Regions:
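A short, charge-rich alpha-helical start-of-domain segment used by transcription regulators
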Residues: 1-19, 29, 35, 43
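A short, mixed-charge helix-start or loop-turn motif at secondary-structure junctions
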Residues: 1-4, 20, 24, 89-92
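Short, structured helix-loop boundary elements
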Residues: 3, 7, 28, 32, ...
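Acidic, proline/glycine-rich intrinsically disordered inter-domain spacer in sigma factors
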Residues: 8, 78, 85-97
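Conserved amphipathic alpha-helical interaction elements at protein-protein interfaces in regulatory
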Residues: 12, 23, 27, 44-48, ...
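Structural recognition of an alpha-helix C-terminal capping motif at a helix-to-coil junction
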Residues: 19, 33-40, 44, 53-65
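Arg/Lys-rich amphipathic alpha helix in sigma70-family domain 2
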Residues: 50, 61-81, 95
Length: 97
C-alpha cells in the first residue's frame, strides 16, 4: 500500500472510524485520539494486511482495540488515584505487622 492509497483511505473512512470510537469512548476528543493512534498503528503494520479489500475492517478492528485499551488505561489510572485517598499504615495509627 502506498502512502497515497492510505491517504485516500483515511479521507474516505475517517468519519466512520471516529463514529466507531465515539460509540465506545463517548467523548469526541478521546475518539479523535483513538482514531489517530489506530491510523498510525495501521500505517506501521500495513505489511501485515494480507488482503487490501479487508482494509476497512482491519483498521476498524484496530480502532476498536485502541479505544478499548484507552478505557482500560483510564480505569487503571482512576483506581490508582482512588487508592491515594486511603491512609497508609503510618497515617492510620495502626502498628506495622
Amino acid at each position: 500500500m502506498t502512502s497515497r492509497q492510505f491517504e485516500q483511505f483515511v479521507a474516505t473512512e475517517r468519519g466512520m472510524l471516529v463514529r466507531l470510537a465515539m460509540n465506545i469512548l463517548h467523548h469526541p476528543e478521546d475518539a479523535d485520539d483513538a482514531v489517530a493512534e489506530a491510523l498510525c498503528k495501521a500505517w506501521e503494520r500495513r505489511e501485515q494486511l494480507r488482503s487490501p479489500d479487508k482494509m476497512r475492517s482491519w483498521v476498524a478492528k484496530i480502532t476498536v482495540n485502541t479505544a478499548l485499551s484507552m478505557i482500560q488505561k483510564r480505569k487503571r489510572e482512576e483506581l490508582v488515584e482512588s487508592m491515594d485517598d486511603y491512609p497508609t499504615n503510618e497515617a492510620s495509627g495502626y502498628p506495622h505487622s
